[in-house]
A protein has these predicted regions:
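Zn-dependent metallopeptidase/amidohydrolase metal-coordination segment
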Residues: 157, 164-179, 184, 243-278
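Generic, well-ordered alpha-helical scaffold segments in large soluble proteins
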Residues: 55-58, 100-107, 199-203, 235, ...
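Midchain, well-structured core segments that form catalytic/ion-binding scaffolds
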Residues: 3-186
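Acidic, glycine-rich active-site loops and adjacent beta-strand->loop/helix elements
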Residues: 33, 217-218, 273-277
Length: 278
């Protein structure tokens, strides 16, 4: 039913060496439910990349620290469950850091209850990395992760409780002189998908990143007068003695790809019930 678009934003930068007397800490966020970035995007679940960017933003300011690396997510069409970042500190600036992280963990759990439960935010000492992200690049990257659209953008005006347009901040990799962000955008409306892609492109361009769009495919507009749909409904009713549920879903289907190749083809999509596909 839905059209999708893959967005990849990239940036290369020259690494800097941390001060020799610095110390490093790894902050890890885990325990989120994750899920399918289409079917479950409307459930208000936490996005690990978004949440950790928020944590890193505050820690970088409060503790005058520097970003060495950031990594979260592994699939474009899955809401990321985990993310981690390595930050570098002056030894004297780490006082109160563990308590700060513990309080932040409690805050996030309170914000997302009861949708999420058992979110963990931990911090641990790690070996001092050989390089850190330059301050300007660091700020631009964290700011763009904070600012970019994530989650439901708009519902379908004529179909109550059904998502029209959404995006998923799926994968973030920063480190080794490179930064890469991958987002999956979805919409049942071509023009809204284009608007979302343009908005995301503009956002990442302000951070100095190069943006490429790929992997787009057509949606599949439902036909309530479809002969095969009516035949299928009658067959289902005879077999099970009840009316089948005919629904629009916020996810890509093979029918969209096939329909783009063979215009006007009468199609339906049916199968077993799917719960928590990711």
């Amino acid at each position: 039913m839905y059209k999708r678009q893959d967005l990849t934003a990239t940036l290369e930068y020259k690494e800097e060496a941390p001060a020799a007397d610095s110390v490093a800490r790894k902050i890890t966020l885990k325990g989120l439910r994750g899920g399918h970035s289409g079917l479950e995007i409307n459930q208000g679940r936490g996005n690990a990349n978004k949440l950790l960017a928020r944590v890193a933003h505050d820690v970088l300011i409060e503790f005058d620290s520097q970003l060495a690396s950031f990594e979260g997510g592994n699939m474009r069409n899955a809401i990321p469950r985990e993310a981690c970042a390595v930050l570098v500190f002056n030894p004297e600036d780490t006082e109160g850091l563990e308590e700060y992280i513990k309080e932040y963990e409690a805050q996030i759990n309170a914000e997302y209850a009861p949708i999420e439960s058992g979110i963990t935010l931990t911090i641990e000492p790690v070996e001092l990395p050989a390089a850190i992200v330059p301050a300007e690049i660091q700020d631009n990257m964290i700011n763009v992760l904070m600012a970019c659209q994530d989650g439901v953008m708009r519902m379908i005006p004529t179909v109550p409780d059904t998502v029209e347009t959404s995006s998923n901040l799926a994968i973030v990799i920063i480190g080794g002189g490179k930064a890469e962000v991958r987002i999956l955008a979805r919409s049942s409306c071509d023009t809204m998908k284009e608007f979302l892609a343009d908005s995301l492109t503009a956002c990442f361009a302000m951070a100095g990143m190069k943006v490429e769009l790929s992997g787009g495919y057509s949606g599949w507009q439902p036909n309530v007068d479809s002969p095969i749909l009516h035949a299928m409904k009658e067959s289902y009713k005879k077999q099970f003695g009840t009316e089948p549920a005919v629904k629009v879903i916020h996810a890509g289907l093979e029918c969209g790809i096939i329909g783009a190749i063979i215009p006007g083809l009468d199609m339906i999509s049916f199968g077993p019930t799917l719960r928590s596909p990711h």
